[in-house]
A protein has these predicted regions:
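A short, N-terminal "cap"/entry segment at the start of jelly-roll beta-barrel domains
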Residues: 1-46, 135-161
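Conserved short histidine dyad/triad with adjacent acidic residue
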Residues: 31-36, 50-66, 101
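Short histidine-centered beta-strand/loop micro-motifs
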Residues: 38-43, 61-66, 108-110
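Short, conserved beta-strand element in jelly-roll/cupin
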Residues: 51-55, 65-83, 121-124
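A generic structural motif
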Residues: 70, 77-79, 86, 102-104, ...
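Short acidic-glycine-tyrosine-enriched beta hairpin
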Residues: 86-101
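Ligand-binding loop in jelly-roll beta-barrel domains
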Residues: 101-127
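Short, charged, solvent-exposed linker or helix-capping segments at domain edges/interfaces
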Residues: 128-133
Length: 161
């Protein structure tokens, strides 16, 4: 059995250049042995489990939908706002929600304390993301990283902040 304790999973802080997007993540699946840089299914887990914390006034990332990935969320603490095709809804500790492929969404924190949740993603090999607000695509190019295109390759945060 592979086992980790959250206290020993490294926390990684990420922030966009303009500061609109910020989060701290703990990649639990990576701590359990998933190779985040491999496309080899033997080195990947069938799903990813990540603990995410969004500070007050920030969003996780731009409004987007995945071409292949499904994501299941479970709110642990704080309050968050979830934007989807129907508008914006508040979520609180204990709430669970799901987005399948093609369902655009964005998670934000408009509260006064961190908004913390688990996300479980089914980790498909060749996912892509579409960003409706900026009409961009993130596509994989035989690597674990995405390239961002809008007719031609562009910066991830262009027209997002």
């Amino acid at each position: 059995m592979k086992k980790v304790n959250l206290a020993h999973v490294p926390a990684e802080q990420r922030q966009s250049p303009g500061g609109k997007y910020a989060k701290t993540i703990k990649e639990i699946s990576v701590a359990l042995g998933r190779d985040p840089h491999s496309l080899d299914l033997a080195k990947r887990h069938p799903f990813d489990l990540t603990l995410v914390s969004i500070p007050p006034g920030k969003s996780y990332c731009p409004y987007h939908c995945h071409g292949a990935e499904s994501e299941l969320y479970l709110v642990i603490s704080g309050r968050g706002m979830v934007r989807d095709k129907d508008g914006t809804s508040e979520v609180v500790a204990g709430d669970a929600f799901f987005f399948g492929p093609g369902e655009a969404h964005q998670l934000s924190n408009n509260g006064t304390e961190d908004f913390t949740y688990y996300v479980i993603a089914d980790n498909p090999r060749h996912d892509s993301c579409y960003y409706p607000d900026s009409d961009k695509w993130a596509v994989s190019k035989e690597s674990p990283d995405y390239i961002i295109v809008r007719g031609t390759e562009t910066d991830y945060y262009k027209d997002e902040e």
